[in-house]
Design a protein with these regions (language model features):
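Rossmann-fold scaffold of SDR-type NAD(P)-dependent oxidoreductases
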Residues: 11, 73-81, 104, 128, ...
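Catalytic loop of short-chain dehydrogenase/reductase
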Residues: 125-165, 175-187
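Conserved glycine-rich cofactor-binding loop
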Residues: 14-15
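Catalytic Tyr-X3-Lys loop
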Residues: 90-109, 127, 151
């Protein structure tokens, strides 16, 4: 689909990978609204890119329903995620271990439920940003890998509900397959693993191959939205040296 004048809502779009996506969407003519907590970062973003902004907690169920009811987006990107506490399995408290579930999965549940129950209009697309940790785990990040895999599952479950109710909404998972320095999650993860392995964070992330800075990530997500060959798949891996690859096809 062409993104020109499409109404797009991006959660967690004020920094990191989300910001790179917002920049790419604006460059392709989309009308973007960014939902995030930090008012100062949102103010700066509004001035620099001309996007609309809403300061809100993405785990606030009431705010979630209000925002989608008011904006009725053509495309919804659920990118917001908390930086997980790092440490080995023998070090993390239950609160630290479950932090990604309390934030990322809770937010995903509320936004997906709102998209299904309002519902969004037929033809809408919802992208759920997961992580490469959903494929291989992340032993230094507690429950993070499991939380990101759950979001992938939830996109699949949401498609099932959409099909059963004949809503015409497509849900897809976006899976960045490498850590990206300059992002909260990427910096925390790379630092933790690099320290454990006795190397610098830059050396650790080099193991993933070609880098994928936030704007490049954004361009790859735009290609998923814009290229018809990605319209039907369920999950797509994004990587600097391999581009976009389908990880899971949509259920027949």
């Amino acid at each position: 689909m062409s993104l020109k004048d499409k109404n797009v809502v991006v959660t967690g779009g004020s920094r990191g990978l989300g910001l790179g996506l917002v920049e790419a969407l604006v460059a392709h003519g989309a009308r973007v609204t960014v939902v995030a907590r930090g008012a100062a970062a949102l103010d700066s973003l509004r001035v620099r890119l001309g996007v609309a902004t809403i300061s809100a907690d993405v785990t606030d169920e009431t705010a979630t329903h209000r925002i989608l009811a008011e904006l009725r987006p053509d495309i919804l990107v659920l990118n917001a995620g908390a930086t997980p506490p790092t440490g080995g399995l023998d070090q993390l408290s239950w609160a630290d271990f479950t932090a990604p579930w309390e934030h990322d999965v809770k937010a995903g549940l509320y936004w997906l439920q709102a998209a299904l129950n309002q519902p969004l209009k037929p033809g809408s697309r919802v992208l759920v940003v997961s992580s490469g940790a959903a494929e291989n785990g992340s032993p230094m990040s507690g429950g993070y890998g499991g939380a990101k895999r759950m979001l992938w599952f939830m996109a699949k479950y949401a498609n099932g509900v959409s099909e059963k109710k004949r809503l015409g909404i497509r849900f897809q998972a976006i899976v960045p397959q490498q850590m990206v320095l300059g992002t909260g999650v990427g910096d925390a993860g790379a630092s933790a693993y690099a320290q454990a392995m006795g190397m610098k964070p830059e050396e650790f992330v080099a193991r993933f191959g070609a880098p994928m800075p936030p704007r490049e990530f954004g361009d790859k997500v735009v290609s998923v939205l814009d290229d018809p060959k990605y319209a039907e798949g369920l999950a797509f891996g994004l990587k600097g040296d391999t581009g976009v690859t389908m990880l899971e096809a949509a259920a027949a």
